[in-house]
């Protein structure tokens, strides 16, 4: 192979890797001048069409006379060839360094990938951590406490409802007792009115009795005066009285009878009045005693009801305070449980994000590993191509360049240049593709044959 073919291949390799081409002073004009004067070999496999055209041009014999041999041009060509050779060696050394760095990076990424795969397998295979068990146990205990508090709350609500029913019943009894008390007070007012009426009647009867007694006294006095007058008149006229007594009925007996009748009537009236008054007073006293006893019992019941109402009110207030405290405690516990659950959810979310991040990192490492494998295979292909090119170049450079000048000096005319021998090299390249599907690695392998052409 010619050095121009090697130069075109190295340039294409530098374009593949993104490096800047190395400037060379070996221009096309110098190659043309060299081929025109010395009949240099045709270019390599960089372009088959150009090489064939170059063969056609170089197939015509070029005769160079001894007089026109330009040693300065040969020396310039040798110097340019040495410069190109040194540049190619530097480029090859740089490519080798880059390839070594790529190899190191690929090994490092393979190690990281193996570590990540091991960690993922361990994370998948191992049981849930102790922290999750502790969290679940704590949540179960908190749920049990919440259920107990709910049961206590229901029990307290039932007791509160029972106390409310008892309070309503006691209020109803209180209302009934109040109505009874009002009825008793109304009856007492009526009885007092009856007592007042009876008192007035008694006073009126007493006045009547007094008036009757006064009348009886007056009648007694009148009767005594009449008796005295009669006695005086009788003593003054005894004979006449005796005569009149014989003629008229006995006045004394008549007065005695009248007096006895009046006394009987008065005593009867007094006795009847006293009996009526006593019976009425006894009835009123019994009614007053009954009413006072009922009133006293009503007052006692009312006081007892008041005491029960006060005790029940205090108990209800205490239960209300306890209920409010339990409600506040339950609310605080619910808020605390909500905050803890939110913290657990945040922790779970953070762990899931971390796992997702690790999966993304692993996928990225796998993609980088795949890209590096592709670059490695491309580098292997280009290194093989370089190796073939270098082998052909070294075999071609084995003949010293100064033989060209001696050959030109000895022969009057340059011989025809035979067409270069084309070599075909086939190489089987194994392409291994590693993909990640649903967290699992899928490895696919394909083989591809590549052919490379060269000239010797």
Curated annotation (Swiss-Prot):
<keyword id="KW-0966">Cell projection</keyword>
<comment type="function">
    <text>Class-III neuronal intermediate filament protein. My form an independent structural network without the involvement of other neurofilaments or may cooperate with other neuronal intermediate filament proteins to form a filamentous network.</text>
</comment>
<feature type="region of interest" description="Coil 2">
    <location>
        <begin position="253"/>
        <end position="395"/>
    </location>
</feature>
<feature type="compositionally biased region" description="Polar residues">
    <location>
        <begin position="1"/>
        <end position="14"/>
    </location>
</feature>
<feature type="region of interest" description="Coil 1B">
    <location>
        <begin position="135"/>
        <end position="230"/>
    </location>
</feature>
<keyword id="KW-0206">Cytoskeleton</keyword>
<dbReference type="GO" id="GO:0005200">
    <property type="term" value="F:structural constituent of cytoskeleton"/>
</dbReference>
<keyword id="KW-0403">Intermediate filament</keyword>
<dbReference type="GO" id="GO:0030424">
    <property type="term" value="C:axon"/>
</dbReference>
<comment type="subunit">
    <text>Forms homodimers (in vitro). Homopolymerizes into a filamentous network (in vitro).</text>
</comment>
<dbReference type="InterPro" id="IPR050405">
    <property type="entry name" value="Intermediate_filament"/>
</dbReference>
<feature type="region of interest" description="Linker 2">
    <location>
        <begin position="231"/>
        <end position="252"/>
    </location>
</feature>
<feature type="region of interest" description="Head">
    <location>
        <begin position="1"/>
        <end position="90"/>
    </location>
</feature>
<protein>
    <recommendedName>
        <fullName>Peripherin</fullName>
    </recommendedName>
</protein>
<feature type="region of interest" description="Disordered">
    <location>
        <begin position="411"/>
        <end position="456"/>
    </location>
</feature>
<feature type="domain" description="IF rod">
    <location>
        <begin position="88"/>
        <end position="397"/>
    </location>
</feature>
<comment type="similarity">
    <text>Belongs to the intermediate filament family.</text>
</comment>
<dbReference type="GO" id="GO:0045098">
    <property type="term" value="C:type III intermediate filament"/>
</dbReference>
<dbReference type="GO" id="GO:0043204">
    <property type="term" value="C:perikaryon"/>
</dbReference>
<keyword id="KW-0597">Phosphoprotein</keyword>
<dbReference type="Pfam" id="PF00038">
    <property type="entry name" value="Filament"/>
</dbReference>
<feature type="compositionally biased region" description="Low complexity">
    <location>
        <begin position="16"/>
        <end position="55"/>
    </location>
</feature>
<feature type="region of interest" description="Coil 1A">
    <location>
        <begin position="91"/>
        <end position="123"/>
    </location>
</feature>
<dbReference type="InterPro" id="IPR039008">
    <property type="entry name" value="IF_rod_dom"/>
</dbReference>
<keyword id="KW-0963">Cytoplasm</keyword>
<keyword id="KW-0175">Coiled coil</keyword>
<dbReference type="GO" id="GO:0005737">
    <property type="term" value="C:cytoplasm"/>
</dbReference>
<feature type="compositionally biased region" description="Basic and acidic residues">
    <location>
        <begin position="434"/>
        <end position="456"/>
    </location>
</feature>
<dbReference type="Pfam" id="PF04732">
    <property type="entry name" value="Filament_head"/>
</dbReference>
<feature type="region of interest" description="Tail">
    <location>
        <begin position="396"/>
        <end position="456"/>
    </location>
</feature>
<feature type="region of interest" description="Disordered">
    <location>
        <begin position="1"/>
        <end position="55"/>
    </location>
</feature>
<dbReference type="GO" id="GO:0005886">
    <property type="term" value="C:plasma membrane"/>
</dbReference>
<dbReference type="GO" id="GO:0045109">
    <property type="term" value="P:intermediate filament organization"/>
</dbReference>
<dbReference type="InterPro" id="IPR006821">
    <property type="entry name" value="Intermed_filament_DNA-bd"/>
</dbReference>
<dbReference type="InterPro" id="IPR002957">
    <property type="entry name" value="Keratin_I"/>
</dbReference>
<dbReference type="InterPro" id="IPR018039">
    <property type="entry name" value="IF_conserved"/>
</dbReference>
<feature type="region of interest" description="Linker 1">
    <location>
        <begin position="124"/>
        <end position="134"/>
    </location>
</feature>
């Amino acid at each position: 192979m010619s050095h121009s073919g090697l130069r075109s291949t190295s340039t294409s390799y530098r374009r593949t890797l993104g490096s800047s081409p190395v400037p060379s002073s070996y221009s096309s004009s110098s190659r043309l001048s060299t081929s025109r004067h010395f009949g240099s070999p045709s270019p390599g496999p960089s372009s088959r069409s150009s090489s064939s055209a170059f063969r056609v041009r170089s197939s015509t014999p070029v005769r160079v006379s001894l007089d026109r041999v330009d040693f300065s041009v040969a020396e310039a060509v040798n110097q340019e060839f040495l410069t190109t050779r040194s540049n190619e060696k530097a480029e090859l050394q740089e490519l080798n360094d880059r390839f070594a760095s790529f190899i190191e990076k690929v090994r490092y990424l393979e190690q990281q990938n193996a570590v990540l795969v091991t960690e993922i397998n361990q994370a998948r295979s191992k049981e849930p951590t102790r922290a999750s068990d502790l969290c679940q146990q704590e949540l179960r205990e908190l749920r049990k406490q919440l259920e107990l508090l709910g049961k206590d709350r229901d029990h307290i609500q039932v007791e509160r409802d029972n106390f409310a029913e008892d309070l309503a019943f006691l209020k109803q009894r209180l209302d009934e007792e109040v109505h009874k008390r009002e009825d008793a007070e109304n009856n007492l007012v009526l009885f007092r009115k009856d007592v007042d009426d009876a008192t007035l009647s008694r006073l009126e009867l007493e006045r009547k009795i007094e008036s009757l007694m006064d009348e009886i006294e007056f009648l007694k006095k009148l009767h005594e005066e009449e008796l005295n007058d009669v006695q005086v008149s009788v003593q003054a006229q005894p004979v006449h009285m005796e005569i009149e007594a014989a003629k008229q009925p006995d006045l004394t007996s008549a007065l005695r009878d009248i007096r006895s009748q009046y006394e009987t009537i008065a005593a009867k009236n007094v006795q009847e009045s006293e009996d009526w008054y006593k019976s009425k007073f006894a009835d009123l006293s019994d009614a007053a005693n009954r009413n006072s006893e009922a009133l006293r019992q009503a007052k006692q019941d009312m006081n007892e009801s008041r005491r029960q109402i006060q005790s029940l009110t205090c108990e209800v207030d205490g239960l209300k305070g306890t209920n409010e405290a339990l409600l506040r405690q339950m609310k605080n516990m619910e808020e605390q449980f909500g905050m803890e659950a939110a913290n657990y959810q945040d922790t779970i979310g953070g762990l899931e994000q971390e796992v997702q991040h690790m999966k993304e990192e692993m996928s990225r490492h796998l993609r980088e590993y795949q890209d590096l494998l592709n670059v490695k295979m491309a580098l292997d292909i280009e290194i093989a191509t370089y190796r073939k090119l270098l082998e052909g170049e070294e075999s071609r450079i084995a003949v010293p360049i100064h033989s060209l000048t001696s050959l030109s000096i000895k022969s009057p005319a340059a011989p025809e240049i035979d067409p270069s021998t084309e070599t075909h090299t086939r190489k089987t390249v194994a392409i291994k593709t590693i993909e990640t599907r649903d967290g699992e690695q899928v490895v696919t392998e394909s083989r591809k044959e590549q052919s490379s052409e060269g000239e010797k």
